[in-house]
């Protein structure tokens, strides 16, 4: 077997999960690099976390990774350095690097333009329209439209769901009542939170959607791996049993039961291969009893948590 070293980007539960998988299968201790230490990996013996100042800045990230790769290759030229982004910020940074790091690392990434279109929720729904992928009815509003009160004119009734189109920018926004995503039962609730968000400095679009009825038992999560030739090699569907109840982690699952749906697999496989995807993809979806369809909420360009 080719000798390799996992290099993980981040310090969250995704990093711990990947490190645990590598340790259980190969007995390896992973090396992780992040701009902030999170609790899941803080005291772990199966992953060494290195904190790098300003590591979420592209120039800092690229320069550091080039130096790291050069040093590690010099130490052991025959060892493969397997680079895996485990968070949205790092997946975005790696896509911006393109092929710049391939002299030292082996990794999958997307063309930066495709990466941005998929990661940004409003453009992801446009892509869903092109590929006839079911998704909730959606109204996207800009900062200027929020000032003009456009969020009051929705093409669907309450309750509604709301989430930021730019999840990376949202990480740096703080205000009373901040959550990863919202469900509003009346217009007053929506107006209060959307105004607070933009007053706190959020600048990107906000996505407001028709709420799909039913509790979390209707949710499904799909993970797929697509190789460098844009062929789907693995797909796994899960039925979430327990969701993280904390406001900033809504949508993160603590327990998932394996599931199977051939129709969902066929549709997602055709989509990923047609857009020439590469790497790991994670989809959140919910079953809509009104039309019998699984509606896509988003794609994450990384493993699911």
Give the residues covered by each predicted segment.
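Oxyanion-binding "anion nests"
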Residues: 247-250, 257-283
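Phosphate-binding site of ATP-dependent enzymes
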Residues: 184-244, 259-266, 287-295
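Active-site nucleotide/adenylate-binding loops and adjacent lid/helix of ATP-dependent enzymes
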Residues: 117-206, 228
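ATP-binding N-terminal substructure of ATP-dependent carboxylate-amine bond-forming enzymes
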Residues: 1-110, 147-148
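Glycine-rich phosphate/pyrophosphate-binding beta-alpha loops
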Residues: 241-253, 300-305
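Conserved metal-phosphate-binding beta-hairpin within the catalytic cores
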Residues: 269-305
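Short acidic/His/Gly/Ser-rich catalytic and metal-binding motifs that mark active-site loops
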Residues: 40-43, 169-173, 243-248
